[in-house]
Amino acid sequence: MTSGYRQAVAMKVARRTQAERTEATTSALVDAARELFARDGYAATSLAAVAARADVTKGAVYHHFEGKQQLFEAVFTREVERMAVPVVEAYSRKKDPWDAFKAGCRAFLDECLDPDLQRIVLLDALTAIGWEEVRRLEGPLLEMMELGILQAAEAGRIAPRPPEPLAHFLYGALCETAMIVARADDQKVAHRQAITEIGRILDGLAID
């Protein structure tokens, strides 16, 4: 084994180790930020508090993120990804494409009962990062809705139509309804009412 080969291997290992450390620190910062954003809210959470919770320096925070807004975006993105899992699972359990779509919408509203998600996604996001950024980061959820509408139309369960307008209409309705639930004095009652009303809208679109 030549010294050049050993040096190349050592450099590769060093790069991988550095990448792993970077990923670990980034993940720790996002975890800490999520905890504090959910508990204290975006406005009341400082980067110094996030650094202390993650057991790193404030300089380390700025090494990985430009500022609090970008850190919130990372937390928000993770919440959207986490939220998508039960939605996809609920969708996949139904054979009928429109029943699957309705199950996915129900799962979305069920997930919105989580108090941490409510604080981060429903209550603070618009103030923290703005409407356009929220919609951009929620793009995967909208794309899932468009696909579900397209599949239901192809199966003859709803009338043929361009999927994008209806997806935006229904997603907007789900988000507004979820915010009503999040602000309700009795969230369980509000959630049941939301499920009922969304169900009526979706049933009205179905072709028997």
Model-derived regions, located:
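Basic, helix-initiating cap at the start of DNA-binding domains
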Residues: M1-D40, A44-V56, Q69-E73
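Hydrophobic alpha-helical segments that form the core
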Residues: G4, A107-D110, E146, R161-I180, ...
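Key DNA-contact positions within bacterial/archaeal DNA-binding proteins
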Residues: G59
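A short His-aromatic
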Residues: Y62-F65, Q69
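Alpha-helical DNA-contacting segments of helix-turn-helix folds
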Residues: E73-E79
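Hydrophobic alpha-helical connector segments
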Residues: A74, V85-D116, L166-L170
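Amphipathic alpha-helical packing segments from all-alpha helical-bundle domains
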Residues: E81-V85, I129-A155, E164-H168, R192, ...
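Short secondary-structure transition hinges
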Residues: L109-L147, E154, M179, R183
